[in-house]
Amino acid sequence: MNFNYFILVLFFITSGHAKSETRDVHQEAENHIKRGSNTGFNFKTLDKEKRSAEEQNLAEDLVKRGSNKGFNFMVDMIQALSNGKRSAEEQDLAEDLVTRGSNKGFNFMVDMINALSNGKRSAEEQDLAEDLVKRGSNKGFNFMVDMINALSNGKRSAEEQDLAEDLVTRRSNKGFNFMVDMIQALSKGKRSAEDQDLAEDLVTRGSNKGFNFMVDMIQALSKGKRSAEQEKDMK
């Protein structure tokens, strides 16, 4: 499922970082944002010409909040994306996730994975996803790197591959990786109904034209198999 280059805005959640360091992070985020510019709703686009005043303010607010200790990115992102923007289909899918979310021991990522497939993914994509899900539960498994390798090698443009490699490298920088943090936040039944709703909202918006590296990686978690080519890439 293609989607407007999802929010690859890297936030420093831990405290004690210098102001100059925070500014660097914001600049890096803006660089990612520029890569993702395309048609359709795209929260992460902070470019003034592309967003309404309200969207600009919400985006800027999220960037500033990113330096606050204990910042809950997902909750604030929900407020930016959900207000009056969901279609009936999006609402139905979100409702399903909300219902699932009330179950004890709910694994949000797994349910989101199921919702992602739901007639929207090819058999090849579904198989890759299922394998990644299984691998992801193994101790010592480098989930993000494996996922990035599966989706980038020989399949992405030079710019997209560069972004993938950049994300892998960031994993070892100062112990911070926004994408990993977000996945951890989504797992283990700790998300609210609103968080779950947001996830499905983002998934359904994937029908918009444009490439979204983050969503493609998440989509790879949906049901299914890996093609021979993808299996080779993963070895």
UniProtKB/Swiss-Prot annotation:
The protein's UniProt keywords, in alphabetical order, are: Amidation, Antibiotic, Antimicrobial, Cleavage on pair of basic residues, Secreted, Signal
Lysine amide: modified positions: K188, K223
**Compartment(s) where it occurs, according to its Swiss-Prot or TrEMBL record:** Secreted
Instruction: Respond yes or no to whether keyword Secreted is given for this record.
Output: yes
Annotated Gene Ontology cellular components are:
extracellular region
The propeptide sits at 19-35, 52-65, 87-100, 122-135, 157-170, 192-205, 227-235
Q: In which tissues is it expressed?
A: Expressed by the skin dorsal glands.
A single BP term in Gene Ontology: defense response to bacterium
Signal peptide range equals: 1-18
Q: Where in this protein does the record say Asparagine amide is found?
A: N83, N118, N153
Q: Does Signal appear among the keywords?
A: yes
Q: What function is annotated for this protein?
A: Maximin-S1 has no antimicrobial activity. Has no hemolytic activity.
Question: Which family does the record claim for this protein?
Answer: Belongs to the maximin-S family.
The molecule here is called Maximins-S type A
Look up and give the organism this protein is from.
Bombina maxima
